[in-house]
Amino acid sequence: ERVLELARKFPKIGIRISIEGLSQKNDELRGRAGGFDKGLRTLLSLREMGVKDIGFGITVSNNNSEDMLSLYRLSKALNMEFATAAFHNSYYFHKDDNVITNRDTVCGNFAELINMQMREKHPKSWARAFFNMGLINYIEGNRRMLPCEAGLMNCFIDPYGEVYPCNGLEAK
């Protein structure tokens, strides 16, 4: 409801609802039953309100890279945006490191996503494909291809309303 309220005040806002896969996988990883359905309902309500820049955001981990591809296809079927991030320590994930242990699988799924994005007719999708190439690079233990602009160009607001430069940093 707070997201819808925000969109009423700022109808030109861009909103990505963080979903970690399809229903079962999302709810398992988030530890909350019905989370996927709530997120999808929120996106559909935003669309009904006339908000145009809406879509899914997924943080890819050891456990959900295959669902990333299904969620991407769903976003395309619904004509919504799709954003990705690589797994990192944050409020939501219960792990002490940022290591992806099944790199080949995760990187292979990212490569498939990149191929789908490159077949689109939108330069924005091509830019996202480049970003995802950078995520493969990051997962393989290499340096970032793009500089981090956390806190300068974006921020993260946790479920308690605390503002962070990004969802992977501890400092407020």
Model-based region annotation:
Residues 2:
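Acidic helix N-cap motif at the loop->helix transition within catalytic regions
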Residues 5-20, 24-164, 168-171:
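Radical SAM enzyme [4Fe-4S]-AdoMet core and its adjacent flexible, acidic
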